[in-house]
């Protein structure tokens, strides 16, 4: 399952979620503004900015369509 760690008022987060929906890729969203207990997990994965997208051992940050396509 794909997980998107997002934040409020984050344009790249919105773009990632829209791209995944348009390509019919199911995902869970964790909003780290609303669920701050996940901030430490994101930092431990080596990321400092949202969105962070994960699937199994694959993780990346930002709106990157070429990487998003690998999630299908």
Curated annotation (Swiss-Prot):
Record Gene3D superfamilies: Glutaredoxin
Domain of life: Bacteria
Pfam family, one: Glutaredoxin
Domain called Glutaredoxin: residue spans: 1-72
Cysteine pairs bridged by disulfides in the record: 10-13
Record keywords: Disulfide bond, Electron transport, Redox-active center, Transport
A Gene Ontology molecular function term of the record: electron transfer activity
BP GO terms, sorted: cell redox homeostasis
Database matches in InterPro entries: GlrX_NrdH, Glutaredoxin, Grx-like_ET, Thioredoxin-like_sf
The keyword Electron transport is annotated on this UniProt entry: yes
UniProt keyword S-adenosyl-L-methionine, yes or no: no
NCBIfam families hit by this protein: GlrX_NrdH (TIGR02194)
Similarity annotation: Belongs to the glutaredoxin family.
Function: Electron transport system for the ribonucleotide reductase system NrdEF.
Record-given protein name: Glutaredoxin-like protein NrdH
Organism of provenance: Lactococcus lactis subsp. lactis (strain IL1403) (Streptococcus lactis)
Gene name of this polypeptide: nrdH
